[in-house]
From Swiss-Prot:
Phosphatase activity is specifically inhibited by 5-((5-chloro-2-methoxyphenyl)sulfonamido)nicotinamide (SBI-425). Glycans are attached at N140, N230, N271, N303, N430. N-glycosylated. Disulfide bonds join C139-C201, C489-C497. This is Alkaline phosphatase, tissue-nonspecific isozyme. The gene is Alpl. It comes from Rattus norvegicus (Rat). One of its GO terms (biological process) is response to lipopolysaccharide. Residues 502-524 form a propeptide. Homodimer. Zn(2+) 1 binds at D60, S110, D378, H379. GO terms for cellular component: extracellular matrix; extracellular membrane-bounded organelle; extracellular space; mitochondrial intermembrane space; mitochondrial membrane; plasma membrane; side of membrane. Residues 1-17 form the signal peptide. Its cofactor is Mg(2+); Zn(2+); Ca(2+). The lineage of its organism: Eukaryota, Metazoa, Chordata, Craniata, Vertebrata.
Amino acid sequence: MILPFLVLAIGTCLTNSFVPEKEKDPSYWRQQAQETLKNALKLQKLNTNVAKNIIMFLGDGMGVSTVTAARILKGQLHHNTGEETRLEMDKFPFVALSKTYNTNAQVPDSAGTATAYLCGVKANEGTVGVSAATERTRCNTTQGNEVTSILRWAKDAGKSVGIVTTTRVNHATPSAAYAHSADRDWYSDNEMPPEALSQGCKDIAYQLMHNIKDIDVIMGGGRKYMYPKNRTDVEYELDEKARGTRLDGLDLISIWKSFKPRHKHSHYVWNRTELLALDPSRVDYLLGLFEPGDMQYELNRNNLTDPSLSEMVEVALRILTKNPKGFFLLVEGGRIDHGHHEGKAKQALHEAVEMDEAIGKAGTMTSQKDTLTVVTADHSHVFTFGGYTPRGNSIFGLAPMVSDTDKKPFTAILYGNGPGYKVVDGERENVSMVDYAHNNYQAQSAVPLRHETHGGEDVAVFAKGPMAHLLHGVHEQNYIPHVMAYASCIGANLDHCAWASSASSPSPGALLLPLALFPLRTLF
């Protein structure tokens, strides 16, 4: 129930808020709806081509509330009110919901979810590339329970494959593409318990270089996990935390180079200048590690040393598209999640906007005729925005009212829990006395926690390209890679494409149509 004085205050604020002149005319809304209807009717002609290429964009922690807030921010960055803005992912014709729970967790983590949307099976919290028979931290439950990913399926089919992330390349999301680990935190052997080492388990950085030796493109952070203990970092020479971590003395970057065929062109780069100086037409393998740990937030990024996510995606695509058999590319906007965990909504939302820019870049470099693009999140966060804000209100601004309990203002953005819980003189902090628009401002939270938590609600799945219509309702998260594999005729779906081709010799554009009409359960 809204109290009368709040109704009056809100009503006055909304009456005085900005309304674009064109939106006062009913014909504007009718014309907009008719255009949307025409586009929807075109979807009756399904794209049943074979997906030569697959691009998966994963916004770590990019729940629906984050998508909406990022949409408003993107518009406001272009000096618009924001609400009417369309993200690149908003333009995708097919949208579904994904159920994100892990096999042992109602509210999931990024490791178990990555195993689901990359390997096609749900798994326990904290484990990557293994089934639910593997228990977290228990190395001896790993063997025999490994599961492979769509990156492996694509490579086995002769496609080029790549990983681009704003986290370290051995973090939860990318690691499920190539590793099998009972613990997502085993970044190098330095983070592993003696028992796990004695039982023969390998750290995730080691597995990156050894499990699938011919990953064509790897870009992100994580340099320190590749070098021997205390090796000085090339960029942060005086920072002890940036030094190498490996206890086994291995130089994994040298090992990566040694695995590449001599007649191929392989390049290791560690800064933006080196990356952009490359001629992608003369690059067969690329390893780019731009930070000792995770990459910098987009708002903090050094333009000389750190490439943007969009720049990494562009270089990756120029390399991968050279393969006539196509490619699979995993792109992670991984620091959306970190911003939320720290209660720094401005950092998180700018990360989401940058990922949307990368989605747009990929769209200009590929075609929906032969490229399936899927955008989704692994999980949500307890992030929200509300308070009856008027149209065009800064997404980082104050709500147009004060609390009817403590008589203090509050920001539109709030968290259910996290580090933003602050008490001053026994009362909730008065946010009008702080710089709530600061890049690192921690939005207020209801419950005090050092790190804000994930949310358990469903997340959106956006899809365009061949067979995108198979993402159409509410799905288990592990369904996603099965759709991508089906569209591309790889993995468990290799045979059905061969059968369709030999049975009727259809044109490439119609290759999957006969099978697209059968229930998917008959194919797996």
